[in-house]
A protein has these predicted regions:
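Non-catalytic connector elements of ABC transporters
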Residues: 13, 233-336
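The feature captures the beta-strand-to-loop junction immediately N-terminal to the Walker
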Residues: 34-36
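Conserved ABC ATPase "signature" region
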Residues: 96-113, 165
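A short, proline-enriched helix->beta-strand linker immediately N-terminal to the Walker B motif
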Residues: 136-140
Length: 336
């Protein structure tokens, strides 16, 4: 264990931005701190790095901590000189700085930029150099705040691929703040999910996706479909929903949003609403389709006061038998 915090609360002004967070970082792992804007991710990172004093709780650090802030600010020097400057601040002997800087630039795919003035770099190139500086100093714990922010999709994808191998180290723990789930999935061995300043989930990405611990975590992870029968709540992601001519559930397309290679469909069912991605030619709004549901997250119904619904299994059976959706059922779809 290289870093641990226990019951950490961090305050900005009179407001608690991070509340009662306990977590640890272990050598050899990349951990993504994931949450929406305003969740308190950067504040927690600053406190863990020692830049902010917590209002409560304790932090235990083993080894040196390096942090790369969100803005990739570079000095008016060459790229190589910028990385060497970071090494000088870190106390690396002068004789080692050149080789260490070139090694870090090579690891992040930026060796060809070494002689370029920093002022001539594109946004993606500046991000690469920013990461190279952080890697070059070889901290025991490396913290990165939104290292891929502000990049277009292609540049971000390329940088993610290079960063994954560059950040991997058996001797170092890496904590990366992100708000994009795709970035977390690409990088992390483990996720820490922060919502409203509270740590609400921790675990390997695939495990959290297969079995989110709560409704709020599921919704944050993209479970935007909802079917509820008064006894059980089923939340789904588009990947769980398949159009199937002989599927057990009847649905009506209420919205179709064009995508590059298909359409995102909003589908009204008897007891809720789900979303699916369909290839072209996709069904149009108003069309009736049949679907099957493969997976999803199940929770006890939190809406005990709803009108009595059939169980999901009975609903599936009745639709299979061809019972039409009446006016009352259509109204329920509209309310869902």
């Amino acid at each position: 264990m290289l870093l641990r915090c226990e019951h950490l609360t961090v305050r900005r002004g009179k407001r608690d931005v991070v509340t009662d967070v306990s977590a640890e970082l272990r050598a050899g792992e990349i951990v993504a701190l994931l949450g929406p804007n305003g969740a308190g991710k950067s504040t927690l990172l600053d406190a863990l790095a020692g830049a902010l004093t917590p209002a409560a709780g304790r932090i235990e650090r083993h080894g040196r901590v390096g942090i790369a802030l969100q803005a990739p600010d570079l000095a008016r020097r060459t790229v190589l000189a910028n990385v060497m400057l970071a090494l000088a601040w870190w106390g690396v002997p002068r004789a080692e700085r050149g080789d260490r800087a070139r090694e870090a630039l090579r690891a992040i795919g930026a060796e060809h930029l070494a002689s370029r003035p920093a002022a001539t770099l594109s946004g993606g190139e500046r991000r690469r150099v920013h990461l190279a500086r952080a890697i070059a100093v070889r901290p025991d714990v490396l913290m990165l705040d939104e290292p891929f922010a502000g990049l277009d999709a292609e540049v971000r994808s390329n940088l993610l691929e290079d960063a994954l191998s560059a950040l991997r180290s058996s001797a170092r723990a890496t904590l990366v703040v992100v708000h994009d789930r795709a970035e977390a999935w690409a990088l992390a061995d483990r996720l820490l999910i922060l919502l409203d300043g509270r740590l609400v989930a921790s675990g390997p990405p695939r495990e959290l996706l297969e079995q989110p611990p709560s409704v709020e975590v599921a919704r944050f992870l993209g479970f935007d479909g909802r079917i509820e029968d008064g006894r059980e709540l089923l939340l789904t992601r588009p990947a769980h929903i398949a159009l199937d001519p002989v599927g057990p559930l009847a649905a009506r397309v209420t919205r179709a949003t064009p995508l590059e290679d298909g359409a995102r469909l909003e589908l009204a069912l008897e007891h809720g609403r789900v979303y699916a991605v369909a290839p072209l030619p996709a069904p149009r709004p108003g069309e009736d389709v049949r679907i099957r549901i493969d997976g999803g997250a199940r929770f006890p119904s939190g809406d005990r006061g709803n009108r009595g619904y059939q169980s999901l299994d009975r609903a599936s059976a009745s639709v299979q038998e061809g019972e039409p959706a009446g006016a009352d059922q259509q109204a329920e779809r509209d309310e869902a």
